[in-house]
Amino acid sequence: MEEIQRYLQLDRSQQHNFLYPLIFQEYIYALAHDPGLNRNRSILLENPGSNNKFSFLIVKRLITRMYQQNHFLISTNDFNKNSFLGCNKNLYSQMISEGFAFIVEIPFSLRLISSLSSFEGKKIFKSHNLRSIHSTFPFLEDNFAHLNYVLDILIPYPVHLEILVQTLRYWVKDASSLHLLRFFLHEYWNLNSLITSKKPGYSFSKKNQRFFFFLYNSYVYECESTFVFLRNQSSHLRSTSFGALLERIFFYGKIERLVEVFAKDFQVTLWLFKDPFMHYVRYQGKSILASKGTFLLINKWKFYLVNFWQCHFSLCFHTGRIHINQLSNHSRDFMGYLSSVRLNPSMVRSQMLENSFLINNAIKKFDTLVPIIPLIGSLAKANFCTVLGHPISKPVWSDLSDSDIIARFGRICRNLFHYYSGSSKKKTLYRIKYILRLSCARTLARKHKSTVRTFLKRSGSELLEEFLTSEEQVLSLTFPRASSSLGGVYRSRIWYLDIFCINDLANSQ
């Protein structure tokens, strides 16, 4: 009971963090206007005072200083007459949204740091490692090999802007900030301009991306946190009583009823959704829910999710947004990789006295491959090759120096090798490397008005060194004559924790 109360109870200190937009009033909307402030953001999160979290005094002084330099003020009474808007309407609306996003991100950052500090004996966990895209793959590699079915979910979007404001109402206790947010959303944008659904997942406009991503993540976080709580408590509650926990505002009035459910109805609890091997991952506007259970169980979860999100979070579900797939028979595009769980057959011979036995054993293995066709399509779109994969020159770079051209091609090659280092098979990467290297040679030959063969004879070693990856460079220095050592390294998978974004050439979509 105490665990449930701790989970759903809002931390008072976190509520207090949101009082400073009311204290600072209009000053907060100049916060994001200083380009150097984001680089020195730690000054807002460090305080030599009592709690070592943040300093109201430092923030107040910074905001006041920037406000005096910018000299602007919003007046909602004579909104149409105010010269603040005019031709710079988009510019100042972007300033407002970025300022609001910057302010509300601070308590969420503190909350993340405090939650991570509970790991490893109150030792501060390196949260930047969790930001890496590759940090998800070791989790999938360790867990998905033991699972059977997966729900591929395209996360829907809210049907009305007011839902986004209502979601923040649980955390932001400053009424003036919420009113300004509501006014801002309804004045400048409608839902179609906020979130576009032309492609799978979400596509935000380039303006105010930080603001929209915050609203979207806070909204999805609210859906996920309540859903995870209900999933964890599914073995203790009846399937008809979960609705009482969804309305956080009235939660404390229903605590006594919850105690009665635990005390009286435990013997007749329905175990419809009990599954200890359930894993959830969200990425790029999508999510996957994998289970070790049967098809019937995962199908129940499908209908449960649809009803849960539609009824209680007003999410708009369309046909085809959620699919059930068997892991052993299905490959999916996941963060630029083609991932699947395949059976790795092996044969074991056992001999007892004069009798021998052959035992066939199949082991599930999480497999990650480089999607060659989409990757060649990205190279063709960038004019490095044709759609069939034949290298061509890049005339746009012909005006650059030879060293700059070689450096650009080499950087693209190393970045692709770095991102796809977790691939089970590296043969595709060597084909991409061949395309980029020959495209570089054709570009240089075009610049010097010579043939590719002549240019490679003259500077072939320089091209070879520039296209070496970091692993190849280490091995070439350690084992200069043992070229076979490269094969052993590239047959293994390596996951890096310093990759925070996907380059267009590394994205399969």
UniProtKB/Swiss-Prot annotation:
Identify one Gene Ontology CC term for this UniProt entry: chloroplast
The keyword Protease belongs to this UniProt entry's keyword annotation: no
Write out the annotated subcellular location. Plastid, Chloroplast
For this protein, the record's InterPro entries field holds:
Domain_X (IPR024937), Maturase_MatK (IPR002866), Maturase_MatK_N (IPR024942)
Q: Molecular function (GO) terms listed? A: RNA binding
Q: Name one GO biological process term.
A: tRNA processing
The answer, when asked if Chloroplast is one of the entry's keywords, is: yes
Record's superkingdom?
Eukaryota
Keyword vocabulary terms for this entry: Chloroplast, mRNA processing, Plastid, RNA-binding, tRNA processing
Entry's family note:
Belongs to the intron maturase 2 family. MatK subfamily.
Function description: Usually encoded in the trnK tRNA gene intron. Probably assists in splicing its own and other chloroplast group II introns.
What PANTHER family does its record include? MATURASE K (PTHR34811:SF1)
This chain belongs to the protein called: Maturase K
Q: What is the lineage of its organism?
A: Eukaryota, Viridiplantae, Streptophyta, Embryophyta, Tracheophyta
